[in-house]
Amino acid sequence: MQKKQKIDRKGALYMAEQLTLTWIGHSCFKLDCGDYTIVFDPYEDGYVPGCPPVRESADLVLCSHDHKDHGASHLVKRIEGRENPFQIQVIHTWHDDQKGALRGRNQIHILDDGTFRMAHM
């Protein structure tokens, strides 16, 4: 059975009653699961034209690669001490077709809490 989805006008996609996925800008998203928060691919201030500065707090920050438009984990305020509800699988890939020679490594994160599964690339 597929869960109902609803997209609101603020960019949040509700996948389940206690899961909220919010687009921050560019490739940056915030996933709230109950009281646990993950931010994906925060970008440096002013580096992505038209995107607001990343001013989020999170239990965990996951970056697909270490470029300024995806790897500014230092901008996210960390929340300590809460248990991660997800099993996280990391698949290492290349950011180009030259085995990383041009743009480096990339990581795909697959999150699974037993009822919800998503990938961020």
Regions found by a protein language model. Give the residues of each.
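Core dinuclear metal-dependent hydrolase active-site scaffold
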Residues: G11-L60, H67-K68, K77-M121
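Short, Lys/Arg-enriched N-terminal segments with co-localized hydrophobic residues
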Residues: M1-Y14
